[in-house]
């Protein structure tokens, strides 16, 4: 990914560093409008996810996470920007006339061919079951439930690694560092998700952040006591507690937030690294 730096003509562009713009001209039959209601609120109107609201209107692109066009070769026609994710997407024209969007694999260019199915070549962008992949293969868009579509390793630059196969399960090392078991019959896509340098971007100004639907972040210590447990006091006061807490009074910074007794506890061999 090429990073574009602006001339320092204004304060807004002085610290701005964005990727070279990939145009977006989506197909009408692969998009639909979505009503982004709530903006971080639940059904009762209470804030459950902070710092969200506003933002530009978006059209949702239908992404093929299942890759169920078996043994039919497709050609990459375009590489487009998707406002709903930080990874790019590719428009695929299949041999039977079907047209679908998929996540852009790193290194894929316009004109490359891809295919999904069993016993297909181990090539970047191809999708096949884990049982047909050799150990050490870099993969993304991994299924958890057979036939449901890829749910793991879908963000920009994400990549997992197949490290073992035993019995009916395969052992994967996920981008978070977690090591877990998944059925060998589940499918995944070979390669890494594109747009690897997304973390090198710098929006440079608050207005660009608002376009993305992200509101300003305010520290709890500068709020009033009615708004946050850290708030209140005369001048710059400490939080007044032994440990920092969330706005709802729960312990923050280090406490495990994963629910207990989940079905997948037995499938996780090693917790994710912090």
Swiss-Prot record:
InterPro entries: NA-bd_OB-fold (IPR012340), Rib_uL2_dom2 (IPR014722), Ribosomal_uL2 (IPR002171), Ribosomal_uL2_bac/org-type (IPR005880), Ribosomal_uL2_C (IPR022669), Ribosomal_uL2_CS (IPR022671), Ribosomal_uL2_dom3 (IPR014726), Ribosomal_uL2_RNA-bd_dom (IPR022666). Part of the 50S ribosomal subunit. Its main location: plastid. It is found in: Plastid, Chloroplast. PROSITE patterns: RIBOSOMAL_L2 (PS00467). This is Large ribosomal subunit protein uL2cz/uL2cy. Keywords: Chloroplast, Plastid, Ribonucleoprotein, Ribosomal protein. It comes from Vitis vinifera (Grape). Belongs to the universal ribosomal protein uL2 family. The keyword Transcription regulation does not apply. GO terms for molecular function: RNA binding; rRNA binding; structural constituent of ribosome; transferase activity. One of its GO terms (cellular component) is mitochondrial large ribosomal subunit. GO terms for biological process: mitochondrial translation. Residues 1-23, 224-274 are annotated as: Disordered. It comes from the Eukaryota.
